[in-house]
Amino acid sequence: MSRSLKKGPFVAYHLLKKINKMNADGKKDVITTWSRSSTILPNMIGFTIAVYNGKQHVPVFISDQLVGHKLGEFVSTRTFKSHIKADKKTKR
């Protein structure tokens, strides 16, 4: 279900404030955030945002193709450990 157009996209205030300050200063430092639900806006292009996956911060470089998506879409929270099949030689 999409968000109402009159409300606009959700971006955490602290993240938006950091982006606007760094745009004004001309810096491109890595920004750490826990806000996986924030929408990527056009003024975030060119930044590297380290998004928390529950264990560590994973860096995501923001390009123009990512605009409109959520930050959490690009950082998986679950690691898949494959199901190890029993070796047939050891069964004999």
Swiss-Prot record:
Subcellular location: Plastid, Chloroplast
One GO process term, biological-process aspect: ribosomal small subunit assembly
Pfam families for the chain: Ribosomal_S19 (PF00203)
Disulfide bonds: none
GO MF terms held by the record: rRNA binding; structural constituent of ribosome
Family: Belongs to the universal ribosomal protein uS19 family.
Gene: rps19
Keywords: Chloroplast, Plastid, Ribonucleoprotein, Ribosomal protein, RNA-binding, rRNA-binding
Chain's role: Protein S19 forms a complex with S13 that binds strongly to the 16S ribosomal RNA.
Protein name per its UniProtKB record: Small ribosomal subunit protein uS19c
Coiled coil: none
